[in-house]
Amino acid sequence: MNKKINSVRGMHDYLPEELKIWKKIENIIQKILTSYCYEEIRLPILEKTKIFQRAIGNITDVVEKEMYSFKDKKGNSLTLRPEGTVGCVRAIIENNLLFQKKQRFWYLGPMFRYERPQKGRYRQFYQLGVEVFGLNTPDIDLEIILLISRLWKCLGINLHIKLEINSIGSKLDRIKYQKELVFFLEKYKNILDEDSKKRLYTNPFRILDSKNDMMQKILKKAPLLKNYINTSAINHFNSLCNMMDSYGIKYIHNQNLVRGLDYYNSTVFEWKIDQIGSQNTICAGGRYDSLVQELGGNKTSAIGFAIGIERLVLLIKSLNIISCKEEDINIYIIFIGELNKIYAISLSEEIRNIYPKLKIFVDFMTCSLSKKIKNAVDSLAHIAILIGANEIKKNCFLLKDLKRGREYFFSKSELILKIKKIFYKQGN
């Protein structure tokens, strides 16, 4: 017996039943983004490894442990994108989009990270990314937060999600703070948990994210980042908070909130939920005002966010908000005898040409008529049309209304009109 083949660990198939929810979510997302005048951009899955190293930082978990990198046949180091912002920045620089006054972009697609798979965290995962370039005032920070808030309301999850926000100042501010944070944590070096010991001299900001109870107690005594932030960043953040207050947006100022990627500065935020265990961040983002210049472009302010689609789907499924009920087939066409198959196909195409919105299914199964009729009923089809040699010869077709339990005989032209009456009632 051949050994069963399986997908790569941490990479999943998304089957039609689940994708019904995905498509409904994606449609809502796209409508909201369009209403805010954001334009879609489609980006390569592969990028040069060095741009992630430059942008994300060599001593981050993403670059050190999580990237899928390899060399191509010419020896170039390439990486499956672990996130979308870097590729988007590369694209706007390469294609001179900022000179065309293009500012607001969105994309949706797979990202890849070599992490330990668990509920809500996979090695291939889908993200919505939204990026805005060229605007440096807190007004655009507010627009981003208003947009996300509107999305949560339209999805029906706004009561199950909370916003945490912080300002992490400039890179220089964080360098000053990092020295003080390391100096403080060295006093507790012997009792730090293993993750914190590893990060103490490489990426101490990630220690602020620790979920360890002992670490949380220690961090309560730690110096606060806000005391090292420049006046401009403080004013920017205070202005944003005042505007959020005026719009009634609820938020938590989490002074330990930092982001795991080096390119962030000033405003950072996360939207969190409680329903899916430790992987409770469903949306995260912030400003990255130096990244465009660091990757070779002109100095350009920027802000963006990403939403994990799998985590969003998990939440919506747990709340039973969006139904994945099978959409009914409108017309189920049954042909009797192999010789009548061509006529059945032709009729289905003719109906599609006249009524392109209808869902039409042609049953190609080689089984009895009674079995095909049962299949039509089980499919929840609205009507079934039976086609046999006699029907074609006499131009008289049996239409079974499976919802009302009625049967009719029609000529082909009458059949086309009856379909219109059934599915295109006046006013619809």
From Swiss-Prot:
Ranges in a coiled coil: none
EC number(s) given by UniProt: 6.1.1.21
First-listed, main subcellular location of the protein, grouped into a coarse class: cytoplasm
CDD domains according to UniProt: HisRS-like_core (cd00773)
Places the protein is found: Cytoplasm
Any one Gene Ontology molecular-function term assigned to this protein's record: ATP binding
GO CC annotations, alphabetized: cytoplasm
Keywords for this protein: Aminoacyl-tRNA synthetase, ATP-binding, Cytoplasm, Ligase, Nucleotide-binding, Protein biosynthesis
Catalysed reaction, written as an equation: tRNA(His) + L-histidine + ATP = L-histidyl-tRNA(His) + AMP + diphosphate + H(+)
Pfam family, one: tRNA-synt_His
Biological processes per GO annotation: histidyl-tRNA aminoacylation
UniProt xrefs under PROSITE patterns: AA_TRNA_LIGASE_II
Assembly behavior: Homodimer.
Family designation: Belongs to the class-II aminoacyl-tRNA synthetase family.
Name under which the protein is recorded: Histidine--tRNA ligase
Taxonomic placement: Bacteria, Pseudomonadati, Pseudomonadota, Gammaproteobacteria, Enterobacterales
Gene name, Swiss-Prot/TrEMBL: hisS
